């Protein structure tokens, strides 16, 4: 096992512990809490994959961070902070929409890279809107927290979420997963639209009818998805 992989996990565990204390002291906002919950699932998956205990890893991570802080000068810290771009948090969904439980009459699940796609194949001939909460850096989607598909009545009929055991994903991973979800929903004659925020930050453009400007490769993937009734 690579030592850098282990030390990275240990530091992430300790930093998560610190962020949890911020939440416990009611010093956090909704986006902060969303990321904390997402990262908790990711750490559990990574711990299982690496065969490491999270509590023990947190203790070692604390020692690593304390050593770094002891050696770090205030001036170097200021320069690092000044050169690091800040990410923004985009919220299509409310806290209620983000945390609501939902059920599928005809459930279907597919793993697309580091993302899990779920949809209800019983939904037919509906107008559906895709909404997502995600972070943005340099005006491009950075990290997807959660994407959900809503009918006009507000029912949740589909979802894309990061897999806890696969830390990290790219903007192309997200766009490919959206293409698969759209293909599966459109198979049953549903009309699917994408939020303006997703269009802007994932594809860098806006389509009046709400459809994402998919690449030919993504369109072919959607077609294969439809034929196989994903």
UniProtKB/Swiss-Prot annotation:
An MF annotation (GO) of this entry: RNA binding
Location of region: PABPN1-binding: 223-230
Region (CPSF4-binding): 180-215
PTM description: Upon interferon induction, ISGylated via host HERC5; this results in the impairment of NS1 interaction with RNA targets due to its inability to form homodimers and to interact with host EIF2AK2/PKR.
Record has RNA-binding as a keyword: yes
Region of interest (RNA-binding and homodimerization), ranges: 1-73
GO BP annotation list: symbiont-mediated suppression of host cytoplasmic pattern recognition receptor signaling pathway via inhibition of RIG-I activity; symbiont-mediated suppression of host gene expression; symbiont-mediated suppression of host mRNA processing; symbiont-mediated suppression of host PKR/eIFalpha signaling; symbiont-mediated suppression of host type I interferon-mediated signaling pathway
InterPro entries according to UniProt: NS1 (IPR004208), NS1A (IPR000256), NS1A_effect_dom-like_sf (IPR038064), uS15_NS1_RNA-bd_sf (IPR009068)
Motif range (Nuclear export signal): 137-146
Composition-biased stretches (Basic residues): 217-230
Family matches, as Pfam families: Flu_NS1 (PF00600)
Region (Disordered): 205-230
Domain of life: Viruses
Gene3D superfamilies: Influenza virus non-structural protein, effector domain, S15/NS1, RNA-binding
Compartment(s) where it occurs, according to its Swiss-Prot or TrEMBL record: Host nucleus; Host cytoplasm
Keywords linked to the UniProt accession: Eukaryotic host gene expression shutoff by virus, Host cytoplasm, Host gene expression shutoff by virus, Host mRNA suppression by virus, Host nucleus, Host-virus interaction, Inhibition of host innate immune response by virus, Inhibition of host interferon signaling pathway by virus, Inhibition of host PKR by virus, Inhibition of host pre-mRNA processing by virus, Inhibition of host RIG-I by virus, Inhibition of host RLR pathway by virus, Interferon antiviral system evasion, RNA-binding, Ubl conjugation, Viral immunoevasion
Keyword Ubl conjugation: yes
Motif Nuclear localization signal location, chain numbering: 34-38
Domain notes: The dsRNA-binding region is required for suppression of RNA silencing.
Quaternary structure and interacting proteins, as annotated: Homodimer. Interacts with host TRIM25 (via coiled coil); this interaction specifically inhibits TRIM25 multimerization and TRIM25-mediated RIGI CARD ubiquitination. Interacts with human EIF2AK2/PKR, CPSF4, IVNS1ABP and PABPN1.
Functional description taken from the UniProt entry: Inhibits post-transcriptional processing of cellular pre-mRNA, by binding and inhibiting two cellular proteins that are required for the 3'-end processing of cellular pre-mRNAs: the 30 kDa cleavage and polyadenylation specificity factor/CPSF4 and the poly(A)-binding protein 2/PABPN1. In turn, unprocessed 3' end pre-mRNAs accumulate in the host nucleus and are no longer exported to the cytoplasm. Cellular protein synthesis is thereby shut off very early after virus infection.
Family: Belongs to the influenza A viruses NS1 family.
Protein's recorded name: Non-structural protein 1
Organism: Influenza A virus (strain A/Beijing/352/1989 H3N2)
Lineage start: Viruses, Riboviria, Orthornavirae, Negarnaviricota, Polyploviricotina
């Amino acid at each position: 096992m690579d030592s850098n992989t282990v030390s990275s996990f240990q530091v992430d565990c300790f930093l998560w512990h610190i962020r949890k204390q911020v939440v416990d002291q009611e010093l956090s906002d909704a986006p902060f809490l969303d990321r904390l919950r997402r990262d908790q699932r990711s750490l559990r998956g990574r711990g299982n994959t690496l065969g490491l205990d999270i509590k023990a890893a947190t203790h070692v991570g604390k020692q690593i961070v304390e050593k770094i802080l002891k050696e770090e000068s205030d001036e170097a810290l200021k320069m690092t902070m000044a050169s690091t771009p800040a990410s923004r948090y985009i919220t299509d969904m409310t806290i209620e929409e983000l945390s609501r439980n939902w059920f599928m009459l005809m459930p279907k699940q597919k793993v697309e890279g580091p993302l899990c796609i779920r949809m209800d194949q019983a939904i037919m001939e509906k107008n559906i809107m895709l909404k997502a909460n995600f972070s943005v850096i340099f005006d491009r989607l950075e990290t997807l927290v959660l994407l959900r598909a809503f009918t006009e009545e507000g029912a949740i009929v589909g979802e894309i979420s990061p897999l806890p055991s696969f830390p990290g994903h790219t903007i192309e991973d997200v766009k490919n997963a959206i293409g698969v979800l759209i293909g599966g929903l459109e198979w049953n004659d549903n009309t699917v639209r994408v939020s303006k925020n997703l269009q802007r930050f994932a594809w860098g453009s806006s389509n009046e009818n709400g459809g994402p400007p998919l690449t030919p490769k993504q369109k072919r993937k959607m077609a294969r998805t439809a034929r196989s009734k994903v």
